[in-house]
Amino acid sequence: MAKVEKKKFTKEYRLKEIQRNLTKKARLKKEYLKVLKDEGYSIPEKPQYEKHDRSSVEAKKALNKQKVRDQREEHKLRKRTQKEKEQSFKEQEMKRIQLSKEKQVERDRRAKKLTQRTKRGQPVMGPKINDLLDKINSDETYTR
């Protein structure tokens, strides 16, 4: 008494199920309309489908094609602007890196001058005084 298991995941089974459901719905609708007629109610008319003329269909297709073209153009424009932004960002980053390297070289040069020592180990005061004078000259509070 073992049941034969149906293979629910096969294409044939699904097609049979769809066909079975369609015939069941058609039979139920027919019975419903027959009962309505027997009880004296008016039977609803079948909906009339509008026939579309070719010009309106072609116009819709043309409109859709135009929309697709517009979307593609917009996408290309967005990509182009994004690439330009990335390029400008890279250029700014390179400038910033170059500027920081130049500042670091200047700091190293200045530090080397300020840490100079005589033969006996005493600090050389000339570069320190010159550095302080340069700072005063470059500061805008002391210049008029």
Swiss-Prot record:
Pfam families: rRNA_processing
UniProt feature, compositional bias: Basic and acidic residues: 47-76, 83-109, 131-144
Protein name, as recorded: rRNA-processing protein FYV7
Renumbered residue ranges of the record's region Disordered: 42-144
Gene designation per UniProt: FYV7
Matching InterPro entries: Fyv7/TAP26 (IPR013730), Fyv7_fungi (IPR017265)
GO cellular component terms listed in the entry, alphabetical order: nucleolus
Role played: Involved in the processing of the 20S pre-rRNA.
